[in-house]
Amino acid sequence: MSAGSGASTTKDDWRQRFQSIWHVDTEYREDANHLPIPICLHARDEVSGRTLSLWRDELLTSTRLPFDNGPDDAMVAFASNAELQSFLSLGLPFPTNVLDPYVENIVAINGNTAVWPPADEKKRKGRPGLLDALKLHGLPARSQEHKDRMRDMILENEDYTPEQRLEIQEYNKEDVDDTIVLGGALSIDSIDHALFRGRYMAAVARMERVGLPVDGEFFLDELAPNWDAIRLHYIQRDDEFHLYDGVNFVEERLWNLIEAKGWDWPLTPTGRYQLKIATIGRQATRYPELKSLARLRDQIAELRINKLINTIGPDGFSRCPLLPYWTITGRNQPSAKDKMFLPSLPKWLQGGLKPPLGMALVELDYVAEEFAIVAGRSGDPDMIADYGKGDVHWQYAIRAGLAAPGAAVDDHIRDLCKILVHGSNYGITPYGIAARAKKSLDWAREMRARWWSTYPVCHQWLGDVVTQARFDEEIRSPFGWRLIVTADTKTRTLMNFTAQAGGADVMQLVSIVATECGITIAAPVHDAFWILAPLDELDTTIARMSEIMTEAGRLVAGIPIRVKVEAVVRWPQCLGDVRKPDAKGQAMWCEVRELVRNGGLQKVVHG
């Protein structure tokens, strides 16, 4: 069965809204800063049949988009953030209306594990590319080998022969032809939601072009050349079980250690011990003697620093694809085959964030956003009241009778309540509560029951959400992001969907409004944002961004969601210069920088 089966018979109605519908594709290579250098553009209006085919010299002389761009016109482009970045490189305005078949195809299949990943590639990650999308809908597609060959030709050359130029332009046209065919198979049940997603892709293009400013000299000239020596230093210091041979981890030594200690250990489907970093981290909570190994592998020893270095250009910015709509809840998942997103790496590395001359770098984050979304969407008056009072973890402790009103915050009780606050929205089990709290199963059962009795309206609402989703065979975010519900969909996925997909709605709305208002977003990070501002406009920019974030939260949750400034870094400082000494990763940042700069490292000899 094709992914498009069951499409509405009114799927073409949205086309009546536009006088022209231009399908557009650009081909480009990248410069040293990972920014696009547009090579050519092909476009076709499906209404009039007009076509355009422009080479780079023609594009460089353009001062306006070469196709219609009014309120009654639309641009259709697959993974449109690439085309929109090309327009930024050319100094051209953005189209008024953007429709992206990449995103709309995800909406069509999101959660339907029967069609994606393909049956013969069930371990495949990511979203369907153009050729995959065509195949999903039972449409003919070119070979992947042809696409790879053309892509390599474009990326690996700076000048093209006349024959190559003709071949590239034909390939450019083929991409447009395929997009038109795919668009005809897709059902768009809400053009307003689709245009919202297109506006977010425009925001993605702007954010990907900015990137995160870093201390390039430190990362490129000091950290990278000394990386193996840094790894060796920490391995020699912290590898108390002698599991490494130089900088290489010897799996058999850990197997032998597990058996010698008699540790209970999870196995792979083939019966081998699981040795992933996350597995060792979880096991370290059971066997504390493993904590130093877990920390060593997570923070230094197994970190492939080259994937971070690959994102940093000569201009001192780290740029990594944001991969919008990559998760089932519509969130980004920034990465690439040879790149890693700096905020996804251990916190100590973020000490190298550094604004450019005359600028400040600011991190703004929401306060208990997921709690607020669930409180607002469920209409639970007690949850809403507790959110309005401040610290939701402590307010829950008071309401649940675990702390007296007016009592000073007890960190131990607050941390226990934090487990319930964070876990209950996705259906954390008593076993999960007991494991995290290091308490008995009876205590965990009582605490879970107390949570639901404390917020009964939310409890009933979450149950109704799950029931309705299973009946409808789908669930949607406040702004229309859809997840197909099948027999395989987990109940905790449905319980958590509103908080996570609602959070994605908030992030997308903030990104759209802020970038369209001229605020420079360096990167969205889950629920937080790193923004850049001139030093003399810092206070007004923070105030404006906070206002946008608060209002976006209100539009999604129904109640204002508070915003806090997490960090302010003013040039010429880096984040590591201003973070508090007890901030996560700060001690490690200072230690590594001191090692590198004071020559306390041993050279690594590779055999």
Where do the model's predicted regions map?
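Active-site-proximal helix-loop-helix substrate-binding element of RNase H-like nuclease domains
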Residues: 32, 39-43, 49-67, 72-187, ...
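Short glycine-rich phosphate-binding loop at a beta-alpha junction
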Residues: 73-81, 365, 432, 530-532
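C-terminal structured "cap/appendage" subdomains that terminate the fold
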Residues: 518-567
